[in-house]
């Protein structure tokens, strides 16, 4: 593409492609920050465009922006929101920490689309100006934090929570299906007293149920938006009614109650709300990683591991060992959880690094946040569909381990005491005999008493 359009800004002239929709500040960012490939997430761009649309409507309503200009900005914003012009937002996240260059990228693209709608030529900002008209009543310092919160809320509600709720249901269904299957428990990776497979799976269901609650509750933190605070939180150059009107419109568009922050100084100077919400994603990752590790252990084998669960065979597992099948979905979701936990560290460091009236680590913070939501959403969907739904019990293996377990001796403790019960277990283990044989050899109780007292079905509490 030939570089044959000249634009001027407050620093000087800038050359850029003739037909591109962005302007000088975007082009300068392309030149100055040619760093890696991490582009600004489109979810954030979408939220920024929503804000521009709402700002134009409010400014028009308050008689702060000429109707003709406002309508052109609104129309241009609607076209972008419909899915057009996605390639007009080329900037990477490694830019100014306030997100100013991305805010200006959006301003310039909307301005040029609006200019064209009004019959002008790209770059003729006397018709529609990126700052004076598209960015009216706004600052990057309140717009970018607002877009962060909007994109975060929508990604959680539309992507993560629906997939997480489906996974929770799958575990609930399995817990009911497996409620009559008695198996041996394990603590410290050693044999323990029995429980049902349904009870074991119910703990996974309950973990997800609690995590869903944590995430839903935390969304309230990011439902407050900074819009109207402008540069440092005072609301300079914004109408006193602007923030409330804009919040109301954003709520209507997104079918979510966004409220104007009561203290915009805090909203601009910190990323505490995003940090808080992402901590729930870290917590979720810790829970899912525990669940996936349990499934990996329980399905290990098929002959020399635990092998109590049978997982779907999705693909060959080895390039050298024929017939091998690996728990690949568990491995995939575990890696995702590791990444989210790492993202949480980066977000936390970014959050504590804001100085005075503005946090300037925002592009990195929101990139990591949205990446966490995206990979968790996709990973959970895949884990559920390709693994969890297809999990089956290996009844033969489960019965074998239950029969051989030494920890069934625990049921004798109330009747013969801890020390004698321990002697039975040790003798059975050392001589490779059954608990019953060891008990009779030590002459602690009769065979009939043993059969009455050592019954796994009486050791599992409420199996429902």
Swiss-Prot record:
Residues the record marks as site: Important for catalytic activity: 331
| Protein EC | 4.2.1.2
SUPFAM superfamilies per the UniProt record, alphabetical? L-aspartase-like (SSF48557)
* Active site positions, chain numbering: 188 (proton donor/acceptor), 318
Which Pfam families does the protein's record reference?
FumaraseC_C, Lyase_1
Domain of life of the native organism: Bacteria
The answer to whether keyword Cytoplasm applies is yes
Task: Copy the pathway line from the protein's UniProt record.
Answer: Carbohydrate metabolism; tricarboxylic acid cycle; (S)-malate from fumarate: step 1/1
Cellular location(s) = Cytoplasm
**Enzyme class at the top of the EC tree:** lyase
Question: What GO MF annotations does this protein's record show?
Answer: fumarate hydratase activity
**GO cellular component annotations of the record:** cytoplasm
Catalyzed reaction equations: (S)-malate = fumarate + H2O
Can you tell me which residues the record assigns to a coiled coil? none
Q: Subunit notes for this chain?
A: Homotetramer.
Which NCBIfam families does UniProt cross-reference here?
A: fumC_II (TIGR00979), PRK12273.1 (NF008909)
Per the entry, what this protein does is: Involved in the TCA cycle. Catalyzes the stereospecific interconversion of fumarate to L-malate.
Q: Which HAMAP family match?
A: FumaraseC
Q: What is this protein called?
A: Fumarate hydratase class II
Species: Wigglesworthia glossinidia brevipalpis
């Amino acid at each position: 593409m030939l570089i044959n359009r000249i634009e001027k800004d407050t620093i000087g002239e800038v050359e850029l492609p003739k037909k591109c929709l962005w302007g000088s500040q975007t082009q300068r960012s392309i030149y100055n920050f040619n760093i890696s490939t991490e582009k600004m997430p489109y979810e954030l761009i979408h939220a920024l465009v929503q804000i521009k649309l709402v700002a134009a409507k409010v400014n028009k309503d308050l008689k702060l922006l000429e109707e003709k200009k406002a309508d052109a900005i609104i129309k241009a914003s609607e076209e972008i929101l419909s899915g057009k012009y996605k390639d007009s937002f080329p900037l990477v996240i490694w830019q100014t920490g306030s997100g100013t260059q991305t805010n200006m990228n959006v301003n310039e693209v909307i301005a040029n689309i609006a200019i064209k709608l009004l019959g002008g030529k790209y770059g003729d900002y006397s018709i529609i100006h990126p700052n004076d008209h598209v960015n009216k009543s706004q600052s990057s310092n309140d717009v970018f934090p607002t877009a962060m919160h909007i994109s975060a809320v929508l990604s959680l509600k539309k992507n993560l929570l629906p997939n997480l709720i489906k996974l929770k249901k799958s575990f609930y269904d399995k817990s009911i299906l497996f409620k009559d299957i008695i198996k041996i428990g394990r603590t410290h990776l050693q044999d323990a007293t029995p429980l049902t497979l349904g009870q074991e799976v119910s703990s996974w269901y309950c973990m997800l149920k609690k995590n869903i609650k944590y995430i839903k509750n935390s969304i309230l933190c990011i439902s407050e938006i900074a819009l109207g605070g402008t540069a440092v939180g005072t609301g300079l150059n914004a109408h006193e009614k602007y923030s409330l009107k804009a919040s109301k419109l954003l709520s209507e568009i997104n079918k979510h109650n966004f409220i104007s922050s009561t203290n915009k100084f805090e909203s601009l100077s910190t990323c505490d709300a995003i940090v808080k919400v992402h901590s729930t994603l870290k917590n979720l990752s810790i829970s899912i990683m525990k669940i996936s590790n349990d499934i990996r252990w329980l399905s290990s084998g098929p002959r020399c591991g635990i092998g109590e669960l049978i997982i779907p065979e999705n693909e060959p597992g080895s390039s050298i060992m024929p017939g091998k099948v690996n728990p690949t979905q568990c491995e995939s979701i575990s890696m995702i959880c590791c990444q989210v936990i790492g993202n949480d560290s980066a977000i936390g460091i970014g959050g504590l690094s804001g100085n005075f009236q503005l946090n300037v680590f925002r592009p990195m913070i929101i990139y990591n946040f949205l990446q966490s939501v995206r990979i968790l959403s996709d990973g959970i969907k895949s884990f559920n569909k390709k693994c969890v739904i297809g999990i089956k019990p290996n009844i033969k293996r489960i019965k074998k381990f239950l029969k051989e377990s030494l920890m069934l001796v625990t049921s004798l403790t109330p009747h013969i005491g801890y020390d004698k019960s321990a002697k039975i277990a040790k003798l059975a283990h050392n001589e490779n005999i059954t608990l019953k044989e060891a008990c009779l050899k030590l002459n602690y109780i009769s065979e009939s008493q043993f059969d009455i007292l050592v019954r796994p079905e009486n050791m599992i509490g409420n199996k429902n």
